[in-house]
Amino acid sequence: MKHIFLRISVIILFCSYLSTGCKKHEELPPYHAKGTIISVTGGCYGEVVLIEVENPPRIGLSGTFSFIGNTDKGVTYHNAIGVPYFSKSGIPDAVPQKVGTRLYFEYRNITEEERGQSTLFSPDPPIVCLAIYGPPSANYYIIKNIISFK
């Protein structure tokens, strides 16, 4: 009887261990995301902070981005969003805008008025570029609030 109880207990513990070992995406509230800054562009590429979003999946785009003349240091991403420089959307200076910073944030869609605003993703004052460069391909949003960062 002890052996049967022991075997059943071991099987239950083993199954519990397997079920907790599976990696699951936690359910975030609507318009909340977690991700890592993978690139910060400027100048002729536009002023964009590129964030690889881990959760929720499928809010961004996949692609590769590299600066002209530096193609061996390209950035490949699978679920990236682009946001304006933090200073342009009211995010405090205490939040570092540098590659590798992990963010948990609240975001929103860009309004039509903001879409027409030329300085949201561009340098102010405008600069003259000798060629046509473009920002990384990504879905673009506005960060409303940084909940945590590290």
Task: Label each region the model flagged.
Residues 16-39:
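Bacterial Sec-dependent N-terminal signal peptides
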Residues 111-150:
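OB-fold/S1-family single-stranded nucleic acid-binding modules
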